[in-house]
Design a protein with these regions (language model features):
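Sec/Tat signal peptide C-region and signal peptidase I cleavage site
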Residues: 23-27
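Bacterial N-terminal signal peptides that target proteins for export
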Residues: 2-13
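Catalytic glycan-binding domains that act on GlcNAc-containing polysaccharides
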Residues: 52-265
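N-terminal mature-domain "stem" immediately C-terminal to a signal peptide or N-terminal signal-anchor/transmembrane
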Residues: 29-63
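Bacterial N-terminal signal peptides
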Residues: 12-22
Length: 265
């Protein structure tokens, strides 16, 4: 390499380094304890000023560090269970029996969903049952505090920063408020959507309404490649859409198995 080429490379490397450093200076600094959370909120709000509304930034500043969220995030062990153990822990037989009853009781709803999105009742009911026990357990953690805490936490800061930006947009749209409560990671509604999924796949209205949540869930699966009339067991075309719902293999297999039993397959 010539000296000129070497100098160019060195100069380019310095520019890249300085740009990266500038980005680090501007960005709110993550942390793994509560001590830096208030300062992080102020930095985040300052960065977002001009892009987020005063109302949504006020909602952000009203959040508190969620120890319940951090505890839940550090303690996720059920996904390490075998499929049989996981189904026993989640109450698989109850989900199937209740799911079959709800399918019959709401036949018109599920028929309309399948007609629109191509997704049958079984996997939707399996998801609904596993996520919230068919709406019975939707969580009691402040949603904005949960998402802000995980955006601040260093483990998955980038992912949850996206979720926090989506949550602030939902505040502007009147879908979330400072009082909204849900699961420990910021999921809301009957099928536990994170804020970005609410933005991308919500079909209108609150996901605390079961029909709205089920339509949104079917929309999510369709957007992830669900093919009308194709199978959804492992190795079949629609299993990939189920994989988009949850990254844990045991959870994916549970949805497929319970869904097929609810559908009577």
């Amino acid at each position: 390499m010539s000296r000129r080429g070497s100098f160019k490379s060195s100069t380019a490397a310095c520019v890249v380094f300085l740009l990266g450093l500038a980005g680090q200076v501007e960005a709110a600094t993550c942390g793994n304890t509560a001590s830096g959370f208030e300062a992080w909120k102020r930095d985040f709000a300052e960065e977002a000023r001009g892009k987020a509304s005063a109302e949504s930034l006020a909602a952000l500043m009203a959040t508190s560090y969620s120890t319940a969220t951090i505890s839940a995030d550090r303690g996720q062990k059920s996904f390490k269970l075998s499929l049989d153990q996981f189904l026993a822990k989640r109450g698989g037989p109850t989900i199937v029996s209740r799911g079959r009853a709800l399918k019959q009781q709401n036949a018109a709803l599920f028929a309309s969903i399948e007609q629109r999105y191509g997704v049958p009742a079984g996997p939707l009911l399996a998801i609904w049952g596993m996520e919230t026990g068919f709406g019975a357990v939707r969580g009691n953690v402040n949603t904005l505090s949960a998402v802000a805490t995980l955006a601040y936490d260093c483990r998955r800061s980038a992912f949850f920063t996206d979720q926090l930006n989506a949550a602030l947009t939902l505040v502007d749209r009147g879908i979330l408020t400072s009082a909204t409560r849900g699961a420990a990671h910021g999921e809301v509604g009957h099928t536990q959507f994170l804020p970005k999924s609410v933005l991308n796949y919500g079909t209108g209205g609150s996901l605390d309404s079961a029909p709205n949540a089920l339509n949104a869930t079917a929309n999510f699966l369709k957007a992830h490649g669900w093919q009308r009339g194709a199978g959804y067991q492992p190795g079949e075309p629609n299993f990939a859409a189920i994989q988009g719902w949850n990254a844990a293999t045991v959870y994916q297999k549970a949805i497929a198995l319970l869904g097929s039993r609810i559908d009577g397959q």
